[in-house]
Structures are given as C-alpha cells and as structure tokens.
C-alpha cells in the first residue's frame, strides 16, 4: 500500500511540477528585489508584523514569508489569483499584481534569506521527532518533497516549511482536506492526497513538530 501511494504521489508531483513550469519557449519573468521593495505595501500590514494574527478561516498567525523561495511565492500568488487557494483577501491582492510584480515581490522576500545567512549563526540540527510524529512523517512522505530538515524542497516551487508558524501550518493542512466550499480550501492533488490520510489531531502534531524546527523563515518588521 505504501509503495502504491508513493507511486501515485510521484505521478502527482510530476503533474504539479509541470503545471508551474514555464510554457515551452516562454521566457521566465525575472524578479528584481530592489523593485520588489517598492511593491510590498499590501504585504507588510500582515506579514511584516511580528505575531500578527488573521481571523479567516480561523485565528492563526499569518505565514512567515521572509526567506521563502521566490518561485514558491509566485506559485502561491498564482494559486490565490486563480482561486486554487480560496482566500478572499489574498485573491484580491494577487489579482492586483502583474507577473512582473509577483516576481519582484517574491525576489524581495527571498533575498531576506541571503541577507540573514551572512549574519546568523549556523542552523541547529532539527530535533528528532517523537515516535508518533516520526511515523506520521514517514506515512506522509513529507521529506520526499520538502527536503532535509523541511527546508530544502526538491522543487523551488514547493515551500520551505521548517520554522513556519505551527498554527498556520495546521490551518493550511486542513484546507487541503476541504472541498466544495466557496471561500475555504486549497486545490492541490499532492497535498490533498497527503492531508486526507490524517486526522486533524495528527495534522496538528505534524504542524507542531515542523514549526519547532529552526529554518530560513522569518518575520522581518517593515
């Protein structure tokens, strides 16, 4: 059964990767972090405040995006824009951005990781999960996409999740299980297949562990 799920997951990963790959012959938009700094006014009101909480679809801290991979940020914004991720506020913001805007904003937030790397001490090894969480990680094949320490995704369009706010991770994981709702839910075949294997209590245990790992993600006050 695990081998079958791994095969299905691999096929789904390939299809999602193809979805976000530039069309053949199309030129990928290159982001400019300097230009991006001038375009983040709509971002900093939530993502630039330490401890800021959202209340939709439930109370949770807004995700850390400083240090996140640029290609993932662009992919996420496009998902909000097309309503593959349902979130009225984020959809309105994403719809206001051109491809160049998205690339610039993403480049700006990714650059924070490089800036921090020069000044920050070496990251500590990830703490070992307890037996229950280790079993859940293996069952979900989490590292096969998110990489060692949950900070080295195998594809740049996938997120770094180590050190992300645990309550946000929990809310996001549950959203992949949500179907047929107008304003809540995320359409992603890979993550839906993973999340639906677990109870909400198990998803919370995963989120709490992953959120406890030191990673590149930060909240940088603006």
Predicted regions and their residues:
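Residue-level hotspots at or immediately adjacent to binding/recognition sites across diverse folds
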Residues: 27, 49, 93, 148, ...
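Gly/Gly-Pro-rich "capping" loops immediately C-terminal to redox-active cysteine motifs
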Residues: 33, 51-80, 91-96, 143, ...
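Inter-heme linker and motif-flanking segments adjacent to c-type heme-binding CXXCH motifs
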Residues: 50-57, 83-86, 111-131, 135, ...
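Extracytoplasmic c-type cytochrome modules immediately beyond a signal peptide or single-pass transmembrane anchor
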Residues: 59, 70-118, 123-125
């Amino acid at each position: 059964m695990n081998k079958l799920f791994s095969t299905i997951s691999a096929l789904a990963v390939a299809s999602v990767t193809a979805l976000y790959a530039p069309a053949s012959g199309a030129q990928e938009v290159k982001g400019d972090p300097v230009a991006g700094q001038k375009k983040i006014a709509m971002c900093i009101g939530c993502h630039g405040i330490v401890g800021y909480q959202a209340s939709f679809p439930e109370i949770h801290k807004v995700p850390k995006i400083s240090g996140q991979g640029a290609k993932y940020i662009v992919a996420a914004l496009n998902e909000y824009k097309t309503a593959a991720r349902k979130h009225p506020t984020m959809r309105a913001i994403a719809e206001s951005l051109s491809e160049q805007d998205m690339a610039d904003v993403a480049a700006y937030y990714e650059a924070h990781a490089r800036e921090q790397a020069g000044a920050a001490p070496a990251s500590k090894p990830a703490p070992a999960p307890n037996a229950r969480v280790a079993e859940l990680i293996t069952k979900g094949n989490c590292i096969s996409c998110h990489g060692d320490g949950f900070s080295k995704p195998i594809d740049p369009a996938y997120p770094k999740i180590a050190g992300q706010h645990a309550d946000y991770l929990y809310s996001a994981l549950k959203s992949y299980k949500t179907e047929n709702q107008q304003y809540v839910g995320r359409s992603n075949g890979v993550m839906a297949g993973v999340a639906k294997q677990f109870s909400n209590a198990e998803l919370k245990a995963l989120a709490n562990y992953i959120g406890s790992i030191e990673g590149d993600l930060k909240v940088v006050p603006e």
